[in-house]
Amino acid sequence: MDIEPLVNKDFVFRCANVNDRLNLIEFMHNNWPGRWTKEVVDYFGSGGTGREYLLCLDNDKICAFAKVGYPNTSDNLISYSMVWRNRFSALGGIGPLGVDKEYRKRHLGRDIVIYGKNVLIENKVSDIIIDWTGLLDFYRPYGFEVWKSYHYLTKLIKEKKHEF
């Protein structure tokens, strides 16, 4: 895995820190209210330092994010991309990630993925997983391929009538 250059030179890409907590929560709430917002609140409430959240900033405004997992990320701070980590020597994970709707169509999605990949490579990961996505054509240009796929199975259970 090689370090790749970012397209956008007018934005700052960096790891979050505890001082970003309120801005990151507000950013998530404004763009993805619900689960992702709750995950950020829970992350900081569980002792997260911000290190697992990568930010793209336009001046001081968060305009994109990616959550990453490092081989040494605590179990209570990991995302789904890291559930396989015991099967790898030094697994890294990317996801979830997103770009503020006002900043889309500027290749920031590409850059936040590349930045996440670069950060994980610099942290000596052996492999990187992006879990639970259907966006295969988005991730393939960055060297990602399907490793596992899931099939959902269902069974209709007919309700039995009881006679009383």
Regions found by a protein language model. Give the residues of each.
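A conserved beta-strand-loop-helix scaffold within acyl/acetyltransferase catalytic domains
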Residues: 32-98
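A conserved mid-domain beta-alpha-beta active-site/ligand-binding segment of alpha/beta enzyme cores
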Residues: 28
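Acyl-donor-binding surface of acyltransferase catalytic domains
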Residues: 1-8, 153-157
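Extended hydrophobic-aromatic, low-complexity segments
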Residues: 24, 35-37, 64-66, 74-79, ...
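A short beta-loop-alpha structural element at the N-terminal edge
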Residues: 10-24
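Conserved acetyl-CoA-binding loop-helix of GNAT-fold acetyltransferases
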Residues: 96-99, 105-118, 141
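Conserved active-site alpha-helix within GNAT-family acetyltransferase domains
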Residues: 110, 122, 126, 132-152, ...
